[in-house]
Amino acid sequence: VYKRQILSISKNKIFEVGDVNQKIEQAKIIMNENVFKDIDPEELAMKLNISYSWFRKVFKDYTGYAPAKYFQELKLRKAKQLLVGTSQSVKEISFMLDYKSTEHFFSLFKKRTGFTPLEYRSFGRETNVEEEDVL
């Protein structure tokens, strides 16, 4: 007997568990491919042809992060890689990652990591920090 596992209904569509996994993975891929841009989670949900409220809930259930928070964490991870692995200035990195301003990037980075970007760069190079792939 074939049993269908139904997870949710969104925009009058029935999604099986495998379909949900696929939508979440598609969203994660799109976010990773666009880390140097600004992504609106509502537009991303529309692109995936699902409602934003459903997308936000299911994405958080699967990843532990709301879509916007997940994307912010991707950007911070990329910033860490660039700080340790390149000689680009903090200003260049903040611009590349599409932050509103260098000050905003600096403040957010310090709040999330406990280090300023320059402290992180220095510490990371001294200790050969490798960012874990948790996202």
Annotate each language-model stretch with its function.
Residues 1-2:
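Short, small-residue-biased leader/transition segments that mark boundaries at the very start
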Residues 10-13, 62-63:
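Short, Lys/Arg-enriched N-terminal segment that forms or immediately precedes the first helix
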Residues 14-21:
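Intrinsic-disorder/low-complexity linker and hinge segments
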Residues 25-33, 37-38, 42, 61-106, ...:
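Terminal helix-turn-helix DNA-binding modules in bacterial transcription factors
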Residues 47, 51-52, 100-101:
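Short coil turns linking two alpha-helices in DNA-binding domains
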